[in-house]
């Protein structure tokens, strides 16, 4: 006779339907977004000035940039990395260095600023 162990397959449990919570009231977008456009323009401001400022700049810059070449780009070495203002290099092995031990870090003197990465 052979020993039969407990099966590892279990029948799936029936799913229970959970009703979504009821809406308390209408959601107002001005509570959640800073980019809400007003329904009507202000009286002292004509409607033509409410255009996208980026679109207006493209039209103005079109004539000026036609005579100029492409804008110079950053050094080819730094193109893939965003510039954070901290110019720390990787360690000697090409791997990032561990952060310094907080107990060993000296506090900078007053009036003397140091850049720490």
Swiss-Prot record:
Residue spans of biased composition, Basic and acidic residues class: 103-117
SMART domains: GAGE
Disordered, as annotated region: 1-117
Compositionally biased tracts (Acidic residues): 32-45, 87-96
Source taxon at top rank: Eukaryota
Signal sequence, renumbered to the chain: none
Pfam families: GAGE (PF05831)
Remaining remarks: This gene belongs to a multigene family expressed in a large variety of tumors whereas in normal tissues, expression is restricted to germ cells. These genes organized in clustered repeats, have a high degree of predicted sequence identity, but differ by scattered single nucleotide substitution. Their sequences contain either the antigenic peptide YYWPRPRRY or YRPRPRRY which is recognized by cytotoxic T-cells.
Family that this chain belongs to: Belongs to the GAGE family.
Cross-referenced PANTHER family: G ANTIGEN 1-RELATED, P ANTIGEN FAMILY MEMBER 5-RELATED
Name this protein carries in UniProt: G antigen 13
UniProt organism field: Homo sapiens
Source species taxonomy: Eukaryota, Metazoa, Chordata, Craniata, Vertebrata
């Amino acid at each position: 006779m052979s020993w039969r162990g407990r099966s590892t397959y279990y029948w799936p449990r029936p799913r229970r339907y959970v009703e979504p919570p009821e809406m308390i009231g209408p959601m107002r977008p001005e509570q959640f977004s800073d980019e809400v456009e007003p329904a009507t323009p202000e009286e002292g401001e004509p409607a033509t000035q409410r255009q996208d400022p980026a679109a207006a700049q493209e039209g103005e810059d079109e004539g000026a940039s036609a005579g100029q070449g492409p804008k110079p780009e950053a050094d080819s070495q730094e193109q893939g990395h965003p510039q954070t203002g901290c110019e720390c290099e990787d360690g000697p092995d090409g791997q990032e260095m561990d952060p310094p031990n907080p107990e060993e870090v000296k506090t900078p003197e007053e009036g003397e600023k140091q850049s720490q990465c």
